[in-house]
């Protein structure tokens, strides 16, 4: 029996053996070459959550006004926007090709800037420190030809500050030259060893005084090559989003009688103890106790159903 032995560059071997049989056979191998990005073959490839924009708990596809010079406004889950000069409209819209959804900003007179960004918590980005990563995104813009990307890390763990008073350190920045044709753009980023406290990725444009800016499939991954977009199943993507924000519809919680305490468990453990709004069909809420796993409260009038919002955003 003959064999071929392939040695690894560290230890161990792979042996390909042919059985001891009479006669001979021929196996023709097709010519070709290619590469495999082993960094991202398994696991949590895209560190940007909801890059597919499928989860939109706040607006469910409806348009949203982003108020100029205001605090950041969350849009589709995990993504926030802010603008300067004048208000703009943001909305999840139909995608292009196999991409189900894109996110679109519509410009307005006097707009001087629009920003679209995500903050990645320490637990999901710590291992990127000292590594090379690739940022990729699809974009088009019917008015402007330049989109700036910027990467930051938080100065203290999971604390990024506000739009007016950021507490971050810039890692790198660059510019994509875009057009009205929906195309992919990529950038390589060297993450410093100090970036162990959370990462922020920001896309920005200038005076979008008209027209539209369309964004799709943003991805941040280990390695120096942009690979295919990481499509996660919807249940997992929703759960990842609910770690930061939950919109529970009316009837999720029921208060059967007056002033009786009722408890509710969150669908996932939240990032930190959330701020909450509980809205009953009648009466008022009191005695609320909240943890990362759920809450309990009483309602002055029952029976009544209630809805709630819980936010643990960065």
Descriptions of predicted regions:
Residues 38-314:
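Extracellular and organelle-lumenal recognition/adhesion modules and their flexible linkers in secreted
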């Amino acid at each position: 029996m003959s064999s071929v032995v392939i040695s690894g560059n560290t230890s161990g071997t792979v042996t390909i053996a042919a059985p001891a049989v009479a006669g001979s056979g021929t196996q023709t191998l097709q010519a070709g070459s290619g590469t495999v990005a082993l960094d991202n073959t398994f696991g949590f490839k895209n560190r940007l959550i909801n890059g597919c924009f499928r989860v939109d708990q706040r607006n469910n596809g409806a348009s949203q006004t982003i108020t100029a010079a205001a605090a950041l406004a969350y849009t589709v889950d995990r993504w926030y926007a802010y603008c300067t000069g004048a208000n703009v409209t943001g909305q999840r819209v139909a995608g292009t090709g196999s991409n189900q959804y894109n996110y679109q900003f519509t410009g307005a007179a006097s707009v001087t800037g629009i920003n679209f960004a995500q903050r990645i918590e320490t637990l999901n980005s710590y291992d990127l420190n000292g590594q090379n990563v690739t940022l990729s995104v699809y974009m088009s813009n019917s008015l402007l030809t330049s989109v700036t990307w910027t990467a930051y890390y938080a100065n203290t763990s999971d604390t990024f500050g506000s739009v007016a008073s950021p507490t971050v350190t810039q890692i790198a920045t660059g510019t994509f030259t875009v057009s009205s044709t929906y195309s992919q753009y990529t950038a390589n980023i060297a993450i410093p060893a100090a970036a162990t406290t959370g990462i922020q990725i920001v896309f920005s444009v200038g005076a979008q005084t008209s027209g539209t800016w369309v964004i799709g499939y943003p991805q941040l991954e280990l390695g120096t090559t942009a690979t295919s977009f990481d499509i996660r199943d919807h249940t997992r993507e929703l759960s990842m989003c609910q770690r930061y924000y939950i919109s529970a519809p009316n009837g999720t919680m029921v208060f059967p009688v007056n002033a009786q305490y009722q408890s509710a468990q969150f669908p996932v453990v939240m990032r930190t103890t959330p701020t909450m709004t509980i809205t009953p069909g009648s009466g008022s809420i009191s005695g609320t106790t909240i943890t990362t796993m759920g809450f309990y409260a009483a309602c002055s009038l029952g029976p009544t159903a209630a809805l709630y919002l819980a936010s643990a955003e960065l």
